[in-house]
Amino acid sequence: PFYFDASVKDIYATLRCGATMHIVPRKFFSLPKKLVHFLNEKRITCIDWVPSALCMIVNFRALDKEKPESLKKVMFLGEVMPTKQFNMWRKALPEVKYANLYGPTEATGDCTYYKIEREFEDTEPIPIGFACSNTEVMLLDGDTLVTEQDTVGEICVRGCSLAHGYFNNPEKTNEAFVRNPLQKNYYERIYRTGDLGKYNAYGEIVFLARKDSQIKHMGHRIELGEIETALSAVPGIRRGCCLYEHKTQKIVAIYEGSTEQKALTEALKEKLPNYMLPNRYVPLEEMPINLNGKIDRTLLKHQYIKEN
């Protein structure tokens, strides 16, 4: 949508380069074959969109009969990229260049950039990469800098791209835009994103989950994002989402696909320890999508999670 924060970059960068910008009609995001045809008809060369759009196209086999032949580059942002669906897309369009981006609105768009070149297993998360120019991205555990591989920390951002704060909301501003604990300069601020990440073996940042999606279950600290990655990699599952029901202390797996629950549980047992296995499964014909093109977790929580 043109009011989405990433649209600022899309609009002005496109026009500044002398390119032509096309806005995809919203109805096409529920009609994958129409969407692919639109890309061909308009001779689209570069796309910047959320992974949900890619998932919809590959899940409904919209590339089987028609491929966007003019496409040269695809950039993803706004959601975790399901690796299985990305591999299916890249297999159909191997000549296209791909990039995975990350960046909250509070940091004026993209903070990290990752050029996807190597191969990934379906269960392996695609990194968000390294910090963009004029931006520093760090992982903090409290006020301590995280540098070790596979150690979880909160993704924090500093640099000239930071916003001044939230309009007419000083309380929220003071919570998120805080003094840099690694610098003596009292006035230097960083933005705590509320997102959790880690470094992989290549030194790349891997997004894990929202901080508020980290739960304590059966005495173990669990990242729901890890369960979602394993769920989305199961054959027959097009998209998956995991929520936690605090009232009953149950992990709820909501998914789009035809896989039977028994087969799904057996597949997850091969990838996850018992304490991370979902306690309840909710199959859907199609995941709800919000106005920004992402999975509507708020709606799913309202419909399928029992609160107080």
Label for each model-derived stretch:
Residues 52-54, 81, 162:
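Alpha-helix capping/helix-boundary segments
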Residues 11, 16-19, 44-48, 58-127, ...:
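Gly/Ser/Thr-rich phosphate-binding loop
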Residues 33-36, 65, 228-229:
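Short hydrophobic/charged patches on amphipathic alpha-helices used for structural packing
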